[in-house]
UniProtKB/Swiss-Prot annotation:
The keyword Plastid applies. Coiled coil: none annotated. It comes from Cyanophora paradoxa. GO terms for cellular component: cyanelle. This is Uncharacterized protein Ycf17. The lineage of its organism: Eukaryota, Glaucocystophyceae, Cyanophoraceae, Cyanophora. It comes from the Eukaryota. Possible role in chlorophyll and/or carotenoid binding.
Amino acid sequence: MQEERNIWNWGFTSGAENWNGRLAMLGFIAALLTESLTGQGTLHFLGIL
């Protein structure tokens, strides 16, 4: 039987790693959009630097 990879499981499982990668890609795209729309890096936009 094939393992369901979209189920949310805690720990180092293949499903959890898939979700981690998907959420990391969304965060990276959000950082790129913030930088391109504001002309500042994410840390400058948030006032950290």
